Amino acid sequence: MDEDDWDDYDYGTYECGCCTCCGCTCYYDEWDEEDDL
């Protein structure tokens, strides 16, 4: 993976193709679970 790809990771647009408008849960599933508590 190129370092430039990490910029896309922050927006959740890399690899899983999550959209930034509806929120990405691909990289933040663990955080979302904590919010449900």
From Swiss-Prot:
Record protein name field: Gene 40 protein
Superkingdom in the source lineage: Viruses
Protein species of origin: Mycobacterium phage L5 (Mycobacteriophage L5)
